Amino acid sequence: MKKVPGPIVLVEPLSGNTSLLIKVNEVLAVRRSRYQEIMVVETEDYGRALILDDYIQSSYYDEAFYHESLVHPAMVTHPAPRDVLILGGGEGATLREVLKHPTVEKAVMVDIDGDVVELSKRFLPQMHQGAFDSPRAEVVIEDGFVYVKRALEEGRKFDVVIMDLTDPYSSEIAKQLYTAEFINQIMKLLRGDGIMVTQAGNSFYFPEAYDMVLSAVKANFPVVAEYNVWIPSFGYAVNYILGSLKYDPRALPAEEVDKRLADRGVKTRFYTGRAHVALMNMPVYRRLR
């Protein structure tokens, strides 16, 4: 955050050479946790936003684009997801979207930073919408790497695993969770028809990091789908990579997606059958040299 003549301006780096300038009307909270600097601010164009180490993680006006695109392609592709694991997602919006599916019996959300969860509960009610208090939710404050290792030792199984972590290039916290070795552990946590999905940053500005994550997923899953969606407050299209042991999200027609959403009573603001098909058919943005 920089103070310049006039308004407060957040200078968010998109790459080492490009930044996005965001006008901030009010700083609601600032805290340095054990892991990162956390801010909750009111912005002019994006509403209330969560910022970690100068990177916007979510904002009120466009978070549905990000969270619905992260959660629902995997959840809808699986015919009956009962047990779901979320790694990251401290603001609670990913948990909120998962719990929209009545098939879910237990959603476990694991975040390393309890301060993010605490501040989100207090300052970001529109994000979590009470999801933290659901009897179907279990919130664990722990390193995801440690949790997954223990879950494997205990024989836990999940139908869907969602990785809603900081970018592989923006923070040291999550880097070990994007390796092929860790993705292999995720695969072993899944039931035989399980699905995992991860956000993978931006393929245009950080192609090497994106390809690292893509290779890690391809090394462990027979079905891999890449897709992306434009997030205005990020200043770029965020990439997602889905790995499946059985079901292919690209095989679902729009009508079937809409039917599954309707049958489950899932209400969305962005994700629909048409959006699903569009996401699965979009090219990946890469630099054209």
From Swiss-Prot:
An example molecular function term from Gene Ontology annotations: spermidine synthase activity
Species annotation: Pyrobaculum arsenaticum (strain DSM 13514 / JCM 11321 / PZ6)
Domain PABS as annotated: residue spans: 5-245
Gene3D superfamilies xrefs: Spermidine synthase, tetramerisation domain, Vaccinia Virus protein VP39
Location in or out of the cell: Cytoplasm
Record-listed E.C. numbers: 2.5.1.16
Keyword Signal part of the UniProt annotation: no
CDD domains: AdoMet_MTases (cd02440)
Reaction equations catalysed: S-adenosyl 3-(methylsulfanyl)propylamine + putrescine = S-methyl-5'-thioadenosine + spermidine + H(+)
Gene Ontology CC annotation, any one: cytoplasm
Subunit comment: Homodimer or homotetramer.
Function: Catalyzes the irreversible transfer of a propylamine group from the amino donor S-adenosylmethioninamine (decarboxy-AdoMet) to putrescine (1,4-diaminobutane) to yield spermidine.
Pathway(s) this gene product operates in, as recorded in its UniProt entry: Amine and polyamine biosynthesis; spermidine biosynthesis; spermidine from putrescine: step 1/1
Residue stretches spanning the membrane: none
Protein name: Polyamine aminopropyltransferase
